Amino acid sequence: MEKPATRKKKSQAPKEEAGAQKATVKGEKTSKGKKATKKPRKPRRPRKEPVLSPEDEAHIFDAFDASFKDDFEGVPVFVPFQRKKPYECGECGRIFKHKTDHIRHQRVHTGEKPFKCDQCGKTFRHSSDVTKHQRIHTGEKPFKCGECGKAFNCGSNLLKHQKTHTGEKPYGCEECGKSFAYSSCLIRHRKRHPRKKH
């Protein structure tokens, strides 16, 4: 039985020539007399630092105390690039990063409620509010407490409920020190304190 013919390995010389061809500039002839086709690499441009407005610089330096600021007067400060928030509400001056958030906010001032519940006709400013509302009609309660199993139609109601298990009472009365799990309970409690006359 004959052994199959094996290929001879190419010598290193042609590879070196190929490498030499790549290094030549377009239009110049290679060692074989052919024109080079690869363009030389352009040097990378230095990265531009963001240009800060005088207001931005003042805002940055306000964070330092006056003596520290004097030490660095005229020294450029690098601040990571932050996208401006170009959408400002004409009514209240509130600024938004995204156009869609600005449009949604405008409905607060116009009173527009373009989203309607199919079952009862109630209208809402946001589509997500309709989705939450429709759970009243369907009886869906997708938010379940891991401790006791009680279910809720709204995630915020589950968070409020979980405070009954943790004992968390973050809302404290400044007058008597009594604490409450819910802000509404604190507001109700404050009404029981006699008002101070100034």
Curated annotation (Swiss-Prot):
Zinc finger (C2H2-type): 87-109, 115-137, 143-165, 171-193
Gene Ontology CC: one annotated term: nucleus
Compositionally biased tracts (Basic residues): 1-12, 32-47
Tissue specificity comment: Predominantly in the spermatocytes and spermatids of testes. It is also expressed in the fetus and embryonic stem cells at lower levels.
SUPFAM superfamilies membership: beta-beta-alpha zinc fingers
GO biological process, one term: spermatogenesis
Gene3D superfamilies named among the record's database cross-references: Classic Zinc Finger
Location of the protein in the cell: Nucleus
Keywords: Developmental protein, Differentiation, DNA-binding, Metal-binding, Nucleus, Repeat, Spermatogenesis, Transcription, Transcription regulation, Zinc, Zinc-finger
Pfam families recorded: zf-C2H2, zf-C2H2_4
Region of interest: Disordered: 1-56
InterPro entries associated with the record: Znf_C2H2_sf, Znf_C2H2_type
Domain of life: Eukaryota
A molecular-function term among this protein's GO annotations: zinc ion binding
Span of the signal peptide: none
UniProt feature, compositional bias: Basic and acidic residues: 13-31
Family assignment from sequence similarity: Belongs to the krueppel C2H2-type zinc-finger protein family.
Its job: A putative DNA-binding regulatory protein associated with meiosis in spermatogenesis.
Protein name (record): Zinc finger protein 41
Species, as recorded: Mus musculus (Mouse)
Organism ancestry: Eukaryota, Metazoa, Chordata, Craniata, Vertebrata
